[in-house]
Structure formats: structure tokens, C-alpha cells
């Protein structure tokens, strides 16, 4: 009896195409486009937010967006193909992680792009090292710890998007115009997401982005980028160089731990929706391979001047919606993302999206991240001990997140590590989870 047969598979009444089933090229292309639509805005949002926060030149912003799409395609290819012990072998779509936005901004303010990419590259092996030991580490990195961190990520990113609503895309425009544009974009997303039409829900963010962009263009709020200079965006490894600063080791390492925990949940959900085992040797082989691939993909992303990659949970919803879990779709989707990343005009167009338009989208995206954290927390039993951990870690994280100046009296090395509410709150949850006595 094989390992696959020894472990019961979950019921998959809605599954039409299984993991290794083949689709005709038209069907595979359509399914791949649905997967790309579900993750497209989420993939370009982290580089856009970071570039805006650091006030990077337009050319650098466009290049970061292009490389994020390219690396998402390459990462998806590695996950789907599963060469040896690398990759999950599932229809696991890979995109740019939201978890690193805050440490990336802090590193960028301290040392620019070289420090950002240097720290990403230096700490990416954390996931590679952790991968073989994941079953034993689950008692330490519990859903409660992961949920606290994900909740803090969502809550503390929301203020960054409010700045985009207030900053004028055009100095001649009244500030209320920006709020109106962001509100209309948000309304479009909510309306489309509420419809009982699969295509509308999957493409809601992209359609709202397009509508907001066209409106701003008509209002003269968009500077049309020059897309005629080159037909191909050739990746330049280490284009901006590398730099390292040890105070940033802990924040970046901790975020890689967090994304590891998130990825385990994503791979488990993908396995269940694909009709594959969610326990046993085959399951753990996929988990280890998937997390290993996340670390490897993040290393490649840093080399190619992009930010850390992780699996996207929203794409599991597409599998559930369409009933298509075939790896073949992943190959097609990876090809689409790589194509988008290699065409400079796409990155330039996305970089020219006015801040109010992007803010209308990201306020919803960051809110959804916060609710995802709540869902993760609800997986655990909220007894007195868990509530203490939750209360203290959220208090520390939110407090420092909104008032980071309270860390200024401390030495610079400590301030740089703990001035992030996400890091300080997450580490508080981790330490309390280890040392608070459990009920016997």
C-alpha cells in the first residue's frame, strides 16, 4: 500500500480536475488567468507601498514592481514543479509577502535599497533551515502566535495607506478629491465582491484599480510613463548592491518565521481542496518542500531586486470556486506572471497609479489581513492563558506601533529591533507562549 493510500483523503465534492489531471490548453489558460487575477493586486501592493513610503524615484518603483511579478512567476514555477525536496507539488501560487512591509521600510530609511535586499538575502535561509524540523516546532510557533502577528500586520499597515488618501496626486486638486477617489475605488471593490458572479469577485480589485486609474487620467492626475524605451525588462542581479546591519537581523528573521507558519496553513488548505492527504508522510513532505521553496524563492527574489515571497492564501479560494486543482494550471499562471514581469510597460503603468487609487484598494486588503489574523487566533482554545498572551502582545504591539518614539531612550541597537510594533508584539506572544505555565 502506498503512502497516499494509507492516509485518508478529504472529501472533495466540488473538485473537477485533481492535482495531476490534464486540461485542454484553452481551459488551462482560463483557469490560470483566474489564479493570476486573484493575486495580481496583492503581488504589486508591497513594492508599491514600500516605494511610496521611501519616496523612491519612478524608475526604481517601476523596476521593483516588474521584478515582483517576475519573481512571483518563478516562485510559483518552483512550488508547482516540486524538483526533489524543493516545492510543494501543489497548485500553490507565490507572491510578494505583506509581512515584510514594515521591516523593509525601516531598513530602507536606515540604509536604502542595498540594506533592504541585503537583509532579505541574509535571513531567507531561515525557512530553508526550519523546513526539516517543522513537525517538532509546531508546539512553539502555535496558531495563537501566528494569529497575533498577522493581526498586528493588518492593523499597523492601515495607517500607511491613509497617507495615500491624504497626499495629493496633483497639487491643483483639493484634498477632498483624493478621499472621494479612494472611497469610490473601495466602493467598486465592495460592490463587485458582493455579487454572486465568480468572475466579478476574482477580478474586483483589478477592475477597481483600472476604473480609478482611468478616472484619474481623465482628471489629469496621471503622468503617462514612457513605455517605448525597451520591449524587455532584463533582470540585473544585485542591481542596487547589498548591505547588512545586525540590528535588523531579528525583525527580518522573525518575519520569516511568521511566513513559515502562514505557509503551513496555506499548504494544508491547498492539500485539502485538492483532494490530497492532510496528514502523514506525503503531507509533511509537501509541507517541508513548500517551506524550503519559499526560502529559496525569497533568496532568488533578493538577488533579482525583489522582496520576500510566500504562498498566497486567496488562491486557495479560486481552487474551491472553480474545482480546478491541476498543477498544469500553475505552469500556465507562472508563465503569465513571468511575461508580465519582463514587459517594462506593465511595471511602468502600475507605478504610475495615483496614491488615492491604491489606497482605496489597500485599506481593504490590510483590513482583510487583520481579519485573517483573527481567524487564525480562533483556531485555538481561548482559555485564560491564551487571553493573557493575546492581551499583552496586542497591547505591546499596537502601543509601540503607534508610538515608536517610546523606544528612543534605549540604545540604538535595541531601538532598531523593537521600534516595530509587529516585531515587538510578535516576540512578546512567542516568549509568553513558551514561558507562561499551561493548565495541567
Segments from the language model and where they lie:
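Juxtamembrane interface elements at the cytosolic ends of transmembrane helices
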Residues: 5-6, 10-12, 43-47, 51, ...
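Generic transmembrane alpha-helix signature in multi-pass membrane proteins
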Residues: 47-51, 100-109, 135, 159, ...
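Membrane-embedded alpha-helical modules
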Residues: 107-227, 333-440
Amino acid at each position: 500500500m502506498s503512502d497516499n493510500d494509507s492516509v485518508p483523503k478529504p472529501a472533495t465534492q466540488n473538485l473537477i480536475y485533481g492535482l495531476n489531471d490534464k486540461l485542454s490548453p484553452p481551459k488551462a489558460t482560463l483557469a490560470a488567468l483566474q489564479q493570476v487575477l486573484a493575486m495580481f493586486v496583492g503581488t504589486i501592493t508591497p513594492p508599491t507601498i514600500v516605494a511610496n513610503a521611501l519616496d523612491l524615484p519612478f524608475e526604481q518603483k517601476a523596476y521593483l514592481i516588474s521584478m515582483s511579478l517576475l519573481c512571483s512567476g518563478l516562485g510559483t514555477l518552483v512550488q508547482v514543479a516540486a524538483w526533489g525536496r524543493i516545492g510543494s507539488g501543489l497548485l500553490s501560487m507565490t507572491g510578494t509577502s505583506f509581512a515584510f512591509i514594515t521591516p523593509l521600510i525601516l531598513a530602507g530609511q536606515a540604509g536604502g535599497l542595498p540594506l533592504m535586499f541585503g537583509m532579505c538575502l541574509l535571513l531567507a535561509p531561515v525557512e530553508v533551515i526550519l523546513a526539516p524540523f517543522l513537525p517538532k516546532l509546531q508546539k512553539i510557533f502555535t496558531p495563537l502566535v501566528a494569529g497575533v502577528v498577522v493581526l498586528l500586520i493588518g492593523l499597523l499597515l492601515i495607517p500607511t495607506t491613509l497617507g495615500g488618501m491624504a497626499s495629493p496626486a496633483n497639487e491643483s486638486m483639493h484634498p477632498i478629491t483624493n478621499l472621494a477617489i479612494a472611497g469610490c475605488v473601495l466602493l467598486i471593490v465592495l460592490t463587485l465582491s458582493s455579487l454572486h458572479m465568480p468572475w466579478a469577485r476574482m477580478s474586483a480589485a483589478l477592475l477597481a484599480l483600472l476604473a480609478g486609474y482611468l478616472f484619474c487620467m481623465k482628471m489629469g492626475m496621471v503622468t503617462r510613463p514612457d513605455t517605448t524605451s525597451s520591449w524587455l525588462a532584463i533582470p540585473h542581479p544585485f542591481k542596487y548592491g547589498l548591505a547588512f546591519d545586525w540590528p535588523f537581523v531579528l525583525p527580518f528573521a522573525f518575519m520569516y518565521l511568521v511566513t513559515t507558519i502562514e505557509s503551513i496553513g496555506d499548504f494544508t488548505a491547498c492539500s485539502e481542496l485538492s483532494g490530497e492527504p492532510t496528514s502523514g508522510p506525503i503531507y509533511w513532505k509537501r509541507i517541508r518542500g513548500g517551506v524550503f521553496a519559499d526560502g529559496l524563492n525569497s533568496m532568488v527574489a533578493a538577488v533579482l531586486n525583489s522582496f520576500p515571497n510566500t504562498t498566497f492564501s486567496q488562491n486557495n479560494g479560486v481552487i474551491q470556486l472553480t474545482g480546478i486543482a491541476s498543477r498544469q494550471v500553475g505552469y500556465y499562471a507562472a508563465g503569465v506572471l513571468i511575461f508580465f514581469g519582463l514587459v517594462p510597460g506593465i511595471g511602468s503603468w502600475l507605478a504610475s497609479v495615483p496614491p488615492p487609487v491604491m489606497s482605496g484598494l489597500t485599506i481593504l486588503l490590510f483590513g482583510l489581513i487583520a481579519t485573517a489574523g483573527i481567524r487564525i487566533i480562533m483556531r485555538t482554545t481561548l482559555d485564560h492563558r491564551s487571553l493573557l498572551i493575546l492581551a499583552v502582545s496586542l497591547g505591546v504591539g499596537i502601543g509601540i506601533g503607534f508610538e515608536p518614539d517610546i523606544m528612543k531612550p534605549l540604545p540604538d541597537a535595541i531601538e532598531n529591533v523593537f521600534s516595530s510594533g509587529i516585531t515587538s508584539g510578535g516576540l512578546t506572544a512567542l516568549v509568553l507562549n513558551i514561558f507562561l505555565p499551561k493548565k495541567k
